[in-house]
Amino acid sequence: MNERMKVWLVEFSNGERIARVGKYEAWKSGAEYIRDTYNALIAEAAAENDREAVRSITVEGLKALTEFKTASVRRGNFECDPLVRVTELEVY
């Protein structure tokens, strides 16, 4: 019984790693991490009443999500450097 299965290893900048069955699930996990990371930075800037930083971080976050989504539509591995890396693996 040599069945192969594809899984996607999602590695986060905080050192956490998870495996997902399905590329969409891997992308979803990565996108959620990117959103959470940028939302924390936005909240920190908002607490300091730094509107320019809030705007700038929001724009950067949207760019990061867009780049991550664009990278995910290609075959194979994709990442949002340095926050998330997704590696396609075959498991036997």
Residues covered by each model-derived region:
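Short, mixed-charge low-complexity intrinsically disordered segments
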Residues: 36-92
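Short aromatic-glycine-(Arg/Gly/Cys) micro-motifs in beta-strand/loop hairpins
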Residues: 2-16
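A short, exposed loop/beta-hairpin motif centered on an aromatic-Gly-Thr core
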Residues: 13-32
